[in-house]
Amino acid sequence: MGLKHFLEKIEPHFLPGGKHEKWYALYEAAATIFYTSGAVTRKAAHVRDALDSKRMMILVWLALFPAMFYGMYNVGAQAFGALTPDLLQQSIANDWHYALANALGINMSSEAGVLGKMLFGAIYFLPIYATVFIVGGFWEVLFATVRKHEINEGFFVTSILFALIVPPTLPLWQAALGISFGVVVAKEVFGGTGKNFMNPALAGRAFLFFAYPANLSGDAVWTAVDGYSGATALAQWAAHGADGLKNAITGQTITWMDAFIGKLPGSIGEVSTLALLIGGAFIVFARIASWRIIAGVMIGMIAMSSLFNFIGSDTNAMFAMPWYWHLVVGGFAIGMLFMATDPVSASFTNVGKWWYGALIGVMCVLIRVVNPAYPEGMMLAILFANLFAPIFDYFVAQANIKRRKARSNG
C-alpha cells in the first residue's frame, strides 16, 4: 500500500462527522507535506501557479540553511577561540552543553575542525530550534483546532527565523516564552497567517528584548562560554569607532571581509552576510521575496548613512560608519532579505514596497546612530515600518483612483 493510498483511506475519519474530526488540522498538515492539497478555488480570484503557499514557505525555510549551518559553525569557532583549559573544565562541570559535547568526544579547542565546531554549535542551536518549533507548533495546532481550519505553513519560517535571531546562550524557557508571544499575540490574536500586521518572529524577539534585556543584549551573551564577554562589532564601533573593531580573542583588527564572511560574535543566523545573500538571492530568483523592498531598504540605508557621514560628529563614532559597514554588521542583512520581505506584514503595492523598504533603511541607521542605549536598529525599524505598510498602500491606491478619475473625466 502506497503512502498516498494510505492517506486517502484514512482521510474520511478526519473529515466532518468522522471519529477523528477534531484532529483534521494535524492530518491535513501531515498529508500536504508529501502531496499537494486537492482543494480548489471556489470563487474569484482564480490563480494558477505550481507553487502553493506550503511549498513557498518550505523554500524560504531551505533558503535559511546556509545561514543556519554557518551560524552553528561560528558558535563553535567563537567559543573554542575563547576557551582556556580552566574555563573548559569549569564549563564541562556547570554547563550541560559542554558536558554533552565532552561526552560525544568533540575536541573543544581552537585546533578543532569545521565539523567539530559545527557539532558544538548544533548543541546550542538545535535545542533552541526544537523548543521554538514544539511550543510554537502547539499554539498553531491549538488555534487551528479551535477555529477548525488547516495549520498554516508560515510557522516553518517563523520558527527558524526566531531561532536564528537570538543569541546562542538564550535560556530555553525564554525561547518558549518569546515564540509564544510572537505566535499568539502578534499573529493568532489578529486571525492567524495572512492577517497579522507585524512579523511574528521579530515581535517575539522584541518582547524578550524589553522583558529580559540582559539575555538579548550586552557583551556576555554572544559567545557560548560562561563568564566570557565579547562585544558585537556594532557595540565596538559605537564605543571606539572604526579603530575599536578588534577580535576580542586574538586582538587583531576585524576587517570588512571578516564581517562579510561572519568571523565575529552575534546572533546565531545573522553573522554571515555572505550566507544570507546566498539564501536571499534564491528567494528573489524564485520570486518569493520582493526585490523592490530589498532595493528600497538599501537605498534608504545608503542615503541615511551618507547623510550622517556628511554631518559628522566629534562625540558619536556611529556618525562615521559608512553604508558598506552597516550592511555587514548586526541584523541588517537577515532583516532586509528575510523579514522586511515578509509578504503579509509588508506593503502590497509596488510603489508602497519602495517606500516601505526605504523607511526600514532610514529607521535602521537612525536608530543605530542616534540611540545611545542600544547600537542595533533593524528589529525596531522593521516593526515600525510594519505599522506604516497599510498606510503606504492606502495612499498609493488613492493616488491611482484619482489618476483614473482624472483620465476618465479628461
Curated annotation (Swiss-Prot):
Composed of six subunits; NqrA, NqrB, NqrC, NqrD, NqrE and NqrF. One of its GO terms (biological process) is transmembrane transport. Its main location: membrane. Its EC number is 7.2.1.1. This is Na(+)-translocating NADH-quinone reductase subunit B. Belongs to the NqrB/RnfD family. GO terms for molecular function: FMN binding; oxidoreductase activity, acting on NAD(P)H, quinone or similar compound as acceptor. Its cofactor is FMN. Signal peptide: none annotated. Keywords: Cell inner membrane, Cell membrane, Flavoprotein, FMN, Ion transport, Membrane, NAD, Phosphoprotein, Sodium, Sodium transport, Translocase, Transmembrane, Transmembrane helix, Transport, Ubiquinone. It is found in: Cell inner membrane. It is a multi-pass membrane protein. NQR complex catalyzes the reduction of ubiquinone-1 to ubiquinol by two successive reactions, coupled with the transport of Na(+) ions from the cytoplasm to the periplasm. NqrA to NqrE are probably involved in the second step, the conversion of ubisemiquinone to ubiquinol. It comes from the Bacteria. GO terms for cellular component: plasma membrane. It is an enzyme of class 7 (translocase). The chain crosses the membrane at residues 56-76, 119-139, 159-179, 266-286, 293-313, 318-338, 347-367, 377-397. It catalyses: a ubiquinone + n Na(+)(in) + NADH + H(+) = a ubiquinol + n Na(+)(out) + NAD(+). Pfam families: NQR2_RnfD_RnfE. The modification FMN phosphoryl threonine is found at residue 232. InterPro entries: NqrB (IPR010966), NqrB/RnfD (IPR004338).
